[in-house]
């Protein structure tokens, strides 16, 4: 069962856990409008309780950008992943490496989800469907007609870009199917970063390797920090 936290305001960071926004987009994505440094400035200005964020650019892996100077300047973990498009909706892939890039064409908008899951697992990456309650591009939109996909145990249950009803569907279906759940803002503009995030209790996650280990470990929970979230 997925435990979900909701809060009305942003509070100070709990030193006993890491809080990461696992789903963000920068200007590297074709529909992104946010510069990475501006995300950092916004987090600092608004004192958002985030220890870092993951850039999940659409249909690509941004191997060239180096954000270590920004990490040092702002005290944030800034990691890079990908959002790919499959025949069962969009999937986030953490821990992208050369072997995975050789096995899968990230630019393909109809990747077989089984291939994404299998190749990610084989190469040490971690793949999980995002915004599964969304029409057309969400995992659960395909389950009624096509059945349940084997090999999925984790999905994004809180998404900062969701409209009413989508996250509720994600949470309900995840509970029914026994899936673990995480959260991400799906921000494409600076002001939406941190709307949803993921808490990792008693863990220090400072790079992609430790993030992938934590995702496989399963000790995490989603949190909504939308301005209109209830207590």
Residue ranges of each PLM-predicted region?
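Domain-core and long-helix interface of multi-subunit machines
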Residues: 6-9, 24-30, 64, 99-195, ...
